[in-house]
Every structure is written in structure tokens, then in C-alpha cells.
């Protein structure tokens, strides 16, 4: 019971990862776990929307090309409904940077990226007010 109490009082930041590639989820899970961040994973935009209706993550790591649409299009919707949630856009398409940022992404990472790139992105969005 003591652990449950400790867990309730812990002010961990929670991340939602929206990514359909299993290997990428594993990599991100290792990074987020190392930083002692809580994280949940979904692999499409519909599940992301359902998750956001019930949970309030501090930030979202959002892939662009997903089975049911494009992350860049989801950014505008998510920012309207959940303006305080920070969004880190990740994609293998650097050309999506301008659209992602115009739509409200707080940070953009192009695949492939390094551990330091991910840590810099997380630090940057958590430093934002």
C-alpha cells in the first residue's frame, strides 16, 4: 500500500506516443523510461483522440504517417482541444517541418534522430509555459 501512496503523490510527467512502428516505440520507451517519464502508446489517430479524451499527458510524441491519417493534420485538432499539451512531431519527411510548425507543433524531429535529439526535444517542450 505504501507504494500506491507514493505513486499517487509522484508528479511524473506523462507522455503519449502516437507511433505505428514497433521498433520506434521500443526505442522511445527506453528513452522515456530512462528519464523516468510515464508513457502510453497508441498506433493511430483515432486511438490518440480517444486517449486524449480520458487522459491529460504533458506532451505527445506524434509520428506523421499513420494508418488512419497524417499527424500534421492531427496537430491542429489536438491544439484546439488540448492547448496546454505540447507536441513533438517525428517523421522521416523533413519537408513536413513547416506544415507541422504552422499547425502548432512545439518541436520537430526528423528521423533518424539521436538520443540527444530526443532528450533536447523533451527538455525544450517541458521548459515551455
PLM region descriptions:
Residues 67:
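The feature encodes the CheY-like receiver
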Residues 44, 70-73:
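Acidic catalytic/metal-coordinating carboxylates
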Residues 1-14, 116-129:
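Non-catalytic signal-transmission and effector/linker regions of two-component phosphorelay proteins
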Residues 41-59:
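Acidic, metal-coordinating helix/loop segments flanking the phosphotransfer/catalytic sites
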Residues 63:
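Active-site residues of response regulator receiver
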Amino acid at each position: 500500500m505504501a507504494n500506491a501512496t507514493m505513486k499517487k503523490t509522484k508528479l511524473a510527467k506523462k507522455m503519449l506516443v502516437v507511433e505505428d512502428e514497433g521498433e520506434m516505440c521500443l526505442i522511445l520507451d527506453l528513452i522515456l523510461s530512462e528519464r523516468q517519464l510515464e508513457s502510453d502508446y497508441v498506433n493511430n489517430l483515432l486511438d490518440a483522440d480517444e486517449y486524449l479524451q480520458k487522459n491529460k499527458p504533458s506532451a505527445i510524441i506524434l509520428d506523421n504517417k499513420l494508418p488512419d491519417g497524417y499527424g500534421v493534420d492531427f496537430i491542429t485538432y489536438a491544439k484546439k482541444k488540448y492547448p496546454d499539451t505540447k507536441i513533438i512531431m517525428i517523421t522521416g519527411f523533413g519537408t513536413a517541418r513547416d506544415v507541422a510548425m504552422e499547425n502548432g507543433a512545439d518541436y520537430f524531429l526528423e528521423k533518424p534522430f539521436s538520443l540527444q535529439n530526443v532528450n533536447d526535444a523533451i527538455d525544450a517542450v517541458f521548459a515551455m509555459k
